Amino acid sequence: QLIKFRDHTDPILYPDINWIDYCMNKAAFQSQHNVNISGGTDRMRYFVSAGMFTQDGMFKQLAASDNFNFNYKRYNYRANLDFDATKTTLISVNIGGRIETKRTPESGEDQNQLFRKLYWAVPFAGAGIVDGKRVVSNADYLPFTGSDGLNSYYGKGFRSTTTNVLNVDLVLDQKLDFITKGLSFKLKGSYNTSYWTQKIASSSMAVYTPVLHDDGSIGYRKSGSDSQLSYSRNSNGEGKSRDWYMEAALNYSRKF
């Protein structure tokens, strides 16, 4: 048996897998794009910005039908408008926000535990994915099998969290030189809101255990079954917050 582990001559019954290398890619794709537009007239200035950021996960898809991998997408936007209502009155409107979607494997635990179990996985606990089937070691042939690197996440679905954040500022800046030169009044109001919702997509995947036949061929004993994704939300699957802010100031700036 030790020779088969060493020489990898029987990778089904006596596997030897580095689960980090088997489950994860060396790198993941990341992209960022931004567009800015600015302009205006004598009485109005504007600035508009939009951006997109994407980050793929490092897990290999292997034979899974659903995309369980880590994934992050963010779309951000901003628009600033300064308008001279009169020669002494400036009105500014600033709108900004972002929409982000984060997907994580549905392991039933926090993500730190997922990676710990991947590092703790036993090299001979399974043969990985063979002909589209997840194969785990047979305890009849090995005194100890433990858990393979796929046990904590593979074929269990994913969680998708969407967050929407909006920030709005309205500013009025009024010169009061008709009272005294250098005097001005500023009024600012802000509204901030955030809303998030989480969707859970659960599934299951059958596990196969290799069995050695008398003629030397290998068959598989099936445990469990494959199921399609089913979507749900838990009681803590959404949340929102909002706040208002108001500020008023009287400023005086003058050189004598």
Segments and roles (model prediction):
Residues 1-9, 107-108:
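Conserved small-residue
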Residues 13-16, 147-153, 226-232:
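Short glycine/proline-rich turn/loop motifs
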Residues 53-74, 104-109, 163-167, 178-256:
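Small-side-chain secondary-structure face that scaffolds active or pore-lining regions
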Residues 11-51, 55-58, 68-147, 159-163, ...:
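Flexible loop and strand-edge segments within Gram-negative outer membrane beta-barrel domains
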Residues 9, 132-133, 216, 226:
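Intrinsic-disorder/low-complexity loop/linker signature
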Residues 48, 93, 170, 185-189:
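Membrane-embedded beta-strand positions of outer-membrane beta-barrel proteins
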Residues 154-158:
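Individual transmembrane alpha-helix segments
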